[in-house]
Amino acid sequence: MTSVFEERVESLKELGARIEAALPTDVVRVEMAKDELQVIAQRPSIAKVLTFLRDDSACRFSQLVDIAGVDYPSREERFEVVYNMLSMHHNQRIRVKISASEDTPVPSVTRVFSSANWFEREAWDMYGIFFSEHPDLRRLLSDYGFEGHAQRKDFPLTGYKEVRYDEELKRVVYEPVRLSQDFRTFDFLSPWEGMDRQIRRVLPGDEKAEGNA
């Protein structure tokens, strides 16, 4: 007997095949990732793909729930842009991904979903992902004088500038970062390294203490 969960997964697989057949040059591949439907799309075609997912009768993903950036510094195109969509009509979700580099503009989808406006601004602010034809691509979460993009993997933990209110000047000032103590790196990999070696042998997962990491 087929469970409701199995029926849902099978329905998503059928939907994925439909999307792949309808957009053969715009979709790189369609896959199931942890029982969720995921579409890897061509970057220049992202607006076309989202429009199809919104308007097709079998899809009807009428809500763009979120746009998220992901940073993989070792990749040639270091950024992934992830579009999470919801179909209230079919009670289904789908995830669409494209890749981009620091110098590659991503087409804005604000004409497809107005909610993309602030999502794209946040991705620009936090990652430096540039969205072409965006109506107002300004920083959203950080202040106007902020340097860099805070959620990139290579962004320093301390940032580049310290922002504070100067009581004498009666305004906000920007200064070089001054730490109250030296920056320290804490190593949490080996919680048992201070224990007796005989005791450590019965505790799993401490490869570093044994000199294997």
Curated annotation (Swiss-Prot):
Superkingdom of the organism of origin: Bacteria
SUPFAM superfamilies (alphabetical): Nqo5-like (SSF143243)
GO molecular function: NADH dehydrogenase (ubiquinone) activity; NADH:ubiquinone reductase (non-electrogenic) activity; quinone binding
Main enzyme class: translocase
Keywords, in A-Z order: Cell inner membrane, Cell membrane, Membrane, NAD, Quinone, Translocase, Transport, Ubiquinone
Gene Ontology CC annotation, any one: plasma membrane
Protein's UniProt keywords contain Magnesium: no
Xref: Pfam families: Complex1_30kDa
Reactions performed catalytically: a quinone + NADH + 5 H(+)(in) = a quinol + NAD(+) + 4 H(+)(out)
Gene3D superfamilies in UniProt: NADH:ubiquinone oxidoreductase, 30kDa subunit
E.C. designation(s): 7.1.1.-
Residue ranges of coiled coil: none
Membrane topology note: Peripheral membrane protein
Presence of keyword tRNA processing: no
Subcellular location as annotated: Cell inner membrane
Family: Belongs to the complex I 30 kDa subunit family.
Biological role: NDH-1 shuttles electrons from NADH, via FMN and iron-sulfur (Fe-S) centers, to quinones in the respiratory chain. The immediate electron acceptor for the enzyme in this species is believed to be ubiquinone. Couples the redox reaction to proton translocation (for every two electrons transferred, four hydrogen ions are translocated across the cytoplasmic membrane), and thus conserves the redox energy in a proton gradient.
Entry-linked PANTHER family: NADH DEHYDROGENASE [UBIQUINONE] IRON-SULFUR PROTEIN 3, MITOCHONDRIAL (PTHR10884:SF14), NADH DEHYDROGENASE UBIQUINONE IRON-SULFUR PROTEIN 3 (PTHR10884)
NCBIfam families according to UniProt: NuoC_fam, PRK06074.1-5
Subunit structure: NDH-1 is composed of 14 different subunits. Subunits NuoB, C, D, E, F, and G constitute the peripheral sector of the complex.
Protein name, as recorded: NADH-quinone oxidoreductase subunit C
